[in-house]
Design a protein with these regions (language model features):
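C-terminal terminal-subdomain/extension
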Residues: 2, 66-117
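Short, charged beta-turn/beta-strand-edge "cap" motif at the junction between a beta-strand
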Residues: 15-19
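Compact nucleic-acid interaction/catalytic patches
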Residues: 20-24, 29-62
């Protein structure tokens, strides 16, 4: 089993929100490396090239990845589209998000789950 790392952008068969179908999509691995090494699962959030403004999202560009990869288009990380997936479902890594961009994503997740006042 390949161990994927936090900040990896990987391809997976990702379900539509109504669970009616799935499509191979890029996702960002959120779970930390220790969790990923010891678990059969990873925690991810979805990416899209639909850049329409939306709460709980962060825009990333092709220059926001550390490794030359196949992130071909500016994308929106959907911090409100979270899933736990078996690592066996992951098809391949295509890029790795820079730490400063990952911090923007985790800030949006924090905004999503923080207590409303």
């Amino acid at each position: 089993m390949s161990t994927y790392k936090q900040r990896d952008i990987v391809l997976v068969p990702f379900p539509f929100s109504d669970l009616s179908q799935q499509k191979v999509r890029p996702v960002l691995i959120l779970s930390n490396d220790d969790y990923n090494r010891h678990s059969a699962d990873v925690v991810v959030c979805g990416l899209t090239t639909n850049l329409a403004p939306a709460p709980y999202s962060a825009i990333i560009d092709v220059t926001d990845v550390e490794q030359a990869g196949t992130l071909r288009h500016k994308s929106k990380v959907k911090a409100d589209t979270l899933a736990t997936l078996e690592q066996a479902l992951l098809i391949k890594q295509v890029a790795r998000l820079k730490p400063e961009c990952f911090n923007l994503v985790t800030a949006e997740i924090h905004n999503l789950i923080r207590e409303s006042r």
